Amino acid sequence: MSKKTYQPSKIRRNRSHGFLVRSRTKNGQAILRRRRAKGRKRLAV
C-alpha cells in the first residue's frame, strides 16, 4: 500500500502559500486583494 500524498509540514506550507510569498508577486497580490474584498478572516495559510 502506498503512503498518503499529504505529509504536513508547517515550514513547507508557509514557504509556498504564506503571506510573504503571496505579497511578493503581482498574482499573489491579486489573490490577497480578492480575499480581502470577499472578507476572508485568513488571507494566507
Curated annotation (Swiss-Prot):
Residues 1-45 are annotated as: Disordered. GO terms for biological process: translation. NCBIfam families: rpmH_bact (TIGR01030). InterPro entries: Ribosomal_bL34 (IPR000271). One of its GO terms (cellular component) is ribonucleoprotein complex. GO terms for molecular function: structural constituent of ribosome. Residues 32-45 have a biased composition (Basic residues). Keywords: Ribonucleoprotein, Ribosomal protein. The keyword Transcription regulation does not apply. This is Large ribosomal subunit protein bL34. Belongs to the bacterial ribosomal protein bL34 family. It comes from Solidesulfovibrio magneticus (strain ATCC 700980 / DSM 13731 / RS-1). Transmembrane segments: none annotated.
